[in-house]
Amino acid sequence: MDYNFKAAEKKWQEKWEEAGVFHAVDNSDKPKFYGLVEFPYPSGAGMHVGHIKAYSGLEVVSRKRRLQGYNVLFPIGFDAYGLPTENYAIKTGIHPRKVTDMNIAKFTSQLKKVGFSFDWTRVVDTTEEGYYKWTQWIFLKMFENGLAFRDKTLVNYCPSCKVVLSNEDSQGGKCDICHSEVVQKSKDVWYLRITEYADKLLDGLNKVDYLPNIKQQQINWIGKSRGAFVNFTLKDIPETLRIYTTRPDTLFGVTFMVIAPEHPIIDKYADKIGNMDAINAYRAECAKKTEFERTQLVKDKTGVCIDGLTAVNPVNGKEIPVYISDYVMMGYGTGAIMAVPAHDDRDYAFAKKFGIDIIEVIRGGNIEEAAYTGDGEMVNSGFLNGLDNKKDSIARMIDYLTEKGIGEGGVQYKMKDWAFNRQRYWGEPIPIVHCPKCGMVAVPYDELPLKLPEVENFDPGSDGESPLAKIDSFVNCKCPKCGGDAKRETDTMPQWAGSSWYFLRYVDPHNDKAFADYDKLKYWMPVDWYNGGMEHVTRHLIYSRFWYKFLYDLGLVPYEEPYQKRTAQGLILGPDGVKMSKSRGNVIDPNEVVDAYGADVLRTYVLFMGDYEKAAPWSESSVKGCKRFIDRIWNLQDILKDGDAYSEKLESAFHKTVKKVSEDIETLKYNTAIAALMTLLNNIYDAGEINRAELKTLLILVNPFAPHVTEEMWSTLGYGEMLAKDASWPAYDPEKCVDSTIEIAVQVNGKLRGKLVVAADISAEDAIAAAKADEKVQSFLTDKNVVKEIYVPGKLVNLVVKG
């Protein structure tokens, strides 16, 4: 009888839902397991095979944990705010709410069709009022505690999307959303003071189990450095230019300074500057460039020497010129840098172009040809001369700066405060009122959620204002503090807001009194295992850890870190080995695979196709191979015999497979776990039969990968009503995982001359004797003297001969 996968899959998906077999139980006496996958953005295109791979890893772990007796929380939801939905609404006139609901329904149907064991009673939707009420609530807590603030600054602005972008959302000078060029624009911006948590974010990495490359990317993103702040005085002006450097030991080599074109000192002393026209012209050119364009290392150096501003090197008293240049940004460091052209490539190129002195202070290179960026003996450096240990030189200089009152040791971070507002409609309204008398005032907590008003036109204003700014009934309000006329904030939060705490809401998704009950958080948190894409290990992972640590400081969550473990899956490439894209026509639709082969085949294939953590191309022939695997499992019914224990011929194979599959699932080696099951299947067919005890174990081992066919066989063959409810994960006996015999190679003078099957615990003496007695080997020993005998236990015998 052929396996009717369409009927079986529909049947078991309905049965699981009716039985509530995947529902997590709060505060159970069982050990808990909280497995988390990144909730999807519900796009109109629906799910792609990348979603399937991303969710299938922890799907297998979660099903295994349930069979091991754990109380499992494996939830799903929808990160549904975002520009693509709003852009679609602008294009079609369909309200984002309606679009979002349609897309969520589509995703839900697709996820259920694949048979994922999510707890569907805990679904969250970031656009639902009961959810974003608490997103706004957390924002107000940050505002109360000084972590949410507003500042006028140059921002990355996308003229196409008409929205302000964070540095993270505009990498490479391109908009993350529409990929058009980003420009600089002066604007009031909401920030979250994530830099206040930089050290806590770094320290927390020592307490969690993240993949090494994930941990390193977070460390690099935060970018903590140690160095010194140094004050450079200005000639005839009562001001200092304060800089930060990681190499204070090179101060004697400073021959010029560079400040950002936006530095306030320029306008403050404009009357003393003799070339303001040239400076203003240069500043106008800089304003047209994105931050990415300005800070590229490989580009022509441009700048203007400021006529009227001269700095003084604090360690040798030499007067040095001050330039403006686009590669210095006000938002990074202090907006001013010291330049040591002999030992910095960018400073060297700048000095060469503008004819500035280059003074060697570290011996080791040829500064006539290039900057020397290595270590060496200090020269031309006064009290540092002769030192050849960088650490000692830096420490000595910091002591000197501190003693003279011209600087001090310090720390800087590459990570900047998080630009947190967007000029769009489809996002969480920022619950702040602007009052001419009281300033910025929080919307009272009992008035949350501050709801999005109904609008007919979602187009942003031509000046980059939010569509909300055009709705007088929303904008005009009373100040919650004084009762006077006021105006609401019209910017909305970025998509990152809702995803920064969703894992907490899963714990208690229907609570209208708090974002989650503390006792439930204490039971379920931290997340035991979080899997997601490598593209989110900096922005999302850092943002959500920041929100969580803030809530921890308020005593609202019970543990220091939200995620105990974080892993990542590799991409599924197109059949051509290139990243899937509509333009290349190499996109695989998971619905088509399910319709043609069944959900179990799709689930098995995405985990069998290669190393889970690495990219792998789609292969239709391998999909068919997984279909044969499922069919062979089904056809075991044709050779089924009675038996309540493993047969002698298959006992060792079963114990080994249980061990292998159990261990491989825990280490992301899903492909080798499936390969082990395929090998066991071959052993069974070679034996010509399988008994009921053996098939029971096999069905349980296969179930996390292919739950539908295993449930159908479990029920049909009378093992029980439902495998997911009745079964327990099998154990193995370590002693029965050891082979009684092994195959060893026999070499003569290093060349393979034969193979032997011997006892696994054979002694060296007996192994060598057996090798010499082998007929094939003896022909290579005739008339030869054996001068050396080597036995590598369990591997080989090598006989070295002469003659």
Where are these regions (language model features)?
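N-terminal catalytic cores of NTP/NDP-binding nucleotidyl/phosphoryl-transfer enzymes
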Residues: 25-94, 100, 123-138, 245-246, ...
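Helix-rich, typically C-terminal accessory recognition domains appended to large enzymatic cores
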Residues: 79, 144-160, 250, 409-438, ...
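Secondary-structure transition/capping motifs at alpha-helix termini
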Residues: 63-71, 91-97, 113-117, 144-150, ...
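NTP-handling and nucleic-acid-processing catalytic cores
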Residues: 3-13, 49, 135-358, 363, ...
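Alpha-helical recognition segments enriched in aromatics with Gly/Pro capping
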Residues: 309-315, 319-332, 361, 475-614
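Conserved oxyanion/phosphate-binding beta-strand-loop segments in alpha/beta enzyme cores
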Residues: 1-36, 66-75, 99-106, 282-324, ...
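Residue patterns forming the tRNA-binding/recognition surfaces of aminoacyl-tRNA synthetases
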Residues: 2, 11, 15-19, 91-241, ...
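Glycine- and acidic
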Residues: 38-47, 119-124, 329-337, 379-383, ...
